[in-house]
């Protein structure tokens, strides 16, 4: 029997009278759920624990959701994550303040906030052109250096080695591999020198990310917050290194986002939290 799963695109409802952003998550639809819904591909909503979840299962529906900025707000969801992970209110207010159309740095013809521009900047990094070509070359070079027996044998998850090969748990190895790949390609090797254990800590956090998404209380989520805080702490150390010493090996997106944040006066602690979400976006999809 085939296993069906879909990403659930989430947003926060702006229903009248509701001030608190509603929590959104990415979930897998199991076979049982699909059978219950009779394999319908129509979008639907679920209300659980006082929260409304909007579920879409088709790419064309996802595009419509992203365009629907009147009733669905991804900014509310993102700001909620920023608070949960340590950004203070002043930083959030600064990042989501409307910027002039003639600002320096990344073009802002529609006069949007940096919080909104960040999404456009990430898309710009992946547009066909010099930035994408540079990223692709780095990925190819990284794979060429690391996809060999010597490197695989040194993998933390390698469990048995012999004269003819090495045994690794596939899921664990793929997760470690793609997290390290995304980190090195976007942030350069300086971050690994600062904290060689960062990918391992992030993987622990990633396995428990649902506790962050569902806003578990501190006393029930220390196993998630401890590795998360380690990752954020390492990112703070990374951005305390002069940019000239790391910019040559990092992606355009990372350097440009840092420049935009510093131009607004965002301090190192808040910068690290913002970049934690960018780190999350860069490595979580390949490793999931």
Annotate each PLM feature.
Residues 149-159, 209, 261-270:
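Active-site-adjacent bridging/hinge elements
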Residues 203-264:
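Cytochrome P450 catalytic core segment centered on helix I
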């Amino acid at each position: 029997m085939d296993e069906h799963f879909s990403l659930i695109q989430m947003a926060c409802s702006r229903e009248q009278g509701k001030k608190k952003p509603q929590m959104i998550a990415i979930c897998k639809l199991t076979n049982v759920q699909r059978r219950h819904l009779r394999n319908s591909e129509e979008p639907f909503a679920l209300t659980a624990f006082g929260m409304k979840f909007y579920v879409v299962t088709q790419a064309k529906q996802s595009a419509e959701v992203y365009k629907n900025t009147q009733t669905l707000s991804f900014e509310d969801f993102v700001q909620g994550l920023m608070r949960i992970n340590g950004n203070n209110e002043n930083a959030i207010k600064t990042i989501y303040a409307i910027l002039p159309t003639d600002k320096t740095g990344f073009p802002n013809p529609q006069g949007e906030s940096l919080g909104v521009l960040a999404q456009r900047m990430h898309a710009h990094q992946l547009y066909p052109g010099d930035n994408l070509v540079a990223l692709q070359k780095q990925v190819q070079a990284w794979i060429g250096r690391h996809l060999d027996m010597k490197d695989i044998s040194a993998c933390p998850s390698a469990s048995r080695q012999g004269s003819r090969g090495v045994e690794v748990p596939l899921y664990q190895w793929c997760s470690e591999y793609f997290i390290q790949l995304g980190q090195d390609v976007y942030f350069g090797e300086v971050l690994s020198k600062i904290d060689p254990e960062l990918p391992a800590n992030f993987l622990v956090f990633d396995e428990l990310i649902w506790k962050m998404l569902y806003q578990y209380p501190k006393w029930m989520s220390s196993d998630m917050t401890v590795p998360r805080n380690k990752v954020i702490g390492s990112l703070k150390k990374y951005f305390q290194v002069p940019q000239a010493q790391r910019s040559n090996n990092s992606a355009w997106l990372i350097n440009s986002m840092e420049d935009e944040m510093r131009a607004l006066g965002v301090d190192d602690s808040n910068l690290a939290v913002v970049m934690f979400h960018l780190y999350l976006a860069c490595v979580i999809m390949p490793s999931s």
